[in-house]
Amino acid sequence: MNTPIKFTTAEEAVKVIKSGDHVHLSSVASAPQCLIKAMCARGEAGELKNVHVHHLHTEGPAPYADPKFEGVFQLDSLFVGANVRKVTQSGYADYIPIFLSETQKLYRSGAVPCNVAMIQVCPPDKHGYVSLGTSVDATLAAIECADHVIAVVNKYVPRAFGQAMIPLSKIDLFVQDDQPLVEAKFSEPSDVEKAIGAHCAELIEDGATLQMGIGAIPNAVLAQLGNHKNLGIHTEMFADGVLPLVRKGVINGEAKKTEPGKMVSTFLMGSQEVYNFIDDNPGVLMMDVGYTNDPYVISQNDRFVAINSAIQVDLTGQVCADSIGTKFWSGVGGQVDFVYGASLSKGGKAIIAMPSITTKGVSKIAPVLDTGAGVVTTRNHIHWLVTENGAVDLYGKTLQERARLVISIAHPSAQEELDRAAFERFGSHHHYIKGYMQK
């Protein structure tokens, strides 16, 4: 069935947006830039007021968040990316704290209205279906709930399978705009990050199912897994680092209980190579975030290993991953979804991995979290903590035992101060690292 599409211009399409509307934008590389530009032009012309914009992490410009649009556009993001970090910290934009698994529920429950969904899709196939490509996440829920769905048809959007495939009947307005997707570039792992990767890799067994983010530490972990067997991927996102392991047959999904033989994700960031990899690839399923990040679904896979990072960890194992003090840096994301899911998995491991010290020489392990810092993963949820100095398992450990273990993998320059803080907090009847506290 060849379904004809009647295209309109971006300028005409965004006329469905009214003052006071809530507008969802598809995520990461799929942010529909031509529609964003046209929407902002209406704002510049004084045609819109109090339009709420929602999205997860996006790559590329975010002009609607410019302070000059105060009173015109209000960004209430579901994750704070680099392109909106400063305006969020200054108060011109805002953030909705929420587990990634529940972002779709905001729309489906009506807690956040969705009047207009602006998305990108690949050209339709002969059956009248298009693909959301790199962004299913909460975008699928937005499409289901929106009064108007505007789709940019872009030949560069990969034809991904799973719940990314939607019928043309779900879309109200079509705009043609063939633009290469934004590519995310990642630096080579440092020696510290390579050491962290090696410690994490030692915790991964053959037949494990993996979740990890993107960036230097995940890439360092993946680089250490070349001799593993029968690994699987069930994650919220992946990037180029998995591709060598897929080609080598290390990642084949054969041991997975859910979608055996398939890689499962909800959004993607990376180079054109990873976009090409998911194009027309039945071995990759792009699914709704309510599925990928459901702790119960995650837990069905034995030996599930979740690797996430942190900004700061205290002596009891509280993990801050969304803010630096009172300043939001990112968001809750899916960390807790996967930490909890992995902890419920038979033989699973939930890992928080980070350098022991910042590039400015500040210890990331602290006696207490900074004032205003958000607790993302609680001390009740944390299991493994990894730095370049080693890996410690905090599960089932007392507060004093945790303090000793956490200090043992802190940066040497910080251990004496942490020793002293532990002594002052927990009393004098236990010694910690350097004999500051002697029984």
Cite the ranges covered by each PLM segment.
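Conserved alpha/beta enzyme-core scaffold
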Residues: 1-439
